A protein has these predicted regions:
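Glycine-rich active-site loops that engage anionic ligands at enzyme catalytic sites
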Residues: 42-125
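N-terminal secretory signal peptides
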Residues: 9-53
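Short, small-residue-biased leader/transition segments that mark boundaries at the very start
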Residues: 1-6
Length: 125
């Protein structure tokens, strides 16, 4: 089936000379994100290194996508009210406003768990 192509889409995130990978969810928001790749963006530090965020332009679709997520380190989410993508470096309480679109593999989140803004390149694997 056509949808099988999206079951486990992987992306590569390059941070300086280091590369980490992430596995995307099978939902409309994740598919919209994948359609934008490759992306060269700056992840901004938010909430004292709890998350790294950026604002896709235009915002990713959230139509028909299940909301609600209790993020743990490595989760890639959309904060629906603002439309920003938030990659969590720390665990956070459950929020109905969060939509999970993927997860950084293994302990790759350590590469992003640093202070300040981080330029990254995101592309399909």
């Amino acid at each position: 089936a056509a949808s099988d192509v999206y079951k486990r889409q992987n992306v590569k995130i390059t941070v300086g000379n280091r590369t980490i990978t992430a596995t995307m969810e099978d939902n409309a928001a994740a598919r919209d994100f994948l359609s934008r790749l490759p992306l060269e963006i700056t992840l901004n530090d938010y909430n004292n290194m709890t998350e790294k965020i950026f604002y896709p332009d235009p915002a990713l679709t959230t139509e028909g996508v299940t909301r609600g997520c209790a993020p743990t380190p490595g989760d890639i989410t959309i904060y629906a009210p603002w439309g920003n993508v938030a990659i969590f470096c720390k665990s956070w309480s459950h929020s109905n406003a969060l939509i999970k679109i993927g997860r950084i593999d293994g302990n790759g989140i350590e590469v992003l768990s640093i202070a300040g803004d981080i330029p990254v390149k995101i592309e399909r694997r």
